[in-house]
Amino acid sequence: SNFLFTEDFTGTVFYPAMQGKEVIKEDEEEVWVRIGAGVEWDDFVAWTVQQGWGGVENLSFIPGHVGAAPVQNVGAYGIEAGERIGRVEAIDLDKAIRVEIAGKDCRFAYRDSIFKREWKNRYIITRVVFRLSKKPEFRLDYGALRSELEKMGGEVNLTNIRQAVIRIRRSKLPDVAEIPNAGSFFKNPVVSREQADRL
């Protein structure tokens, strides 16, 4: 969802700018929220933390928009967006119709989804529905995150986890207001057991 051009581009860029955040279903344990594809990803994460809903707090301060999250299956610090996506709403360009695609049908994998493969260029994502927890269970498997939380002191909660992630990210990346960037993007190599043993 973030473009960094190295030269002039003469084609057409379609930018889905759908806004909006709404609760569509909730019970004692969970809340389902429908978010416009054009909502800034970090604005969405900040909103969930303010509401006290867990599930995406480790994904704080990632640049981009909500509509790109299902394509890349964005992830950080032990959490991937696909774990929390209940469905994706989109326009099927082949059939010129609106569709709803269940999260389980998106074939989420490590930094991957069906939108990058079989369905590449077929759908325009308009909204994403996330399933969030009202009783969050924190993921603190990453040493850097645990260490930052310890340095900060205080209790482990959604707000402090978000702040710890932001502090870590700010220490690694330049301020986008000063040096425009698309954040960090990389994919850890996936190797066979045999290759890992050799290494």
Label every model-predicted segment.
Residues 98-199:
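Phosphate/pyrophosphate- and phosphate-bearing ligand-binding catalytic cores of soluble enzymes
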Residues 1-94:
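Anion-binding (especially nucleotide phosphate/pyrophosphate-binding) glycine-rich loop
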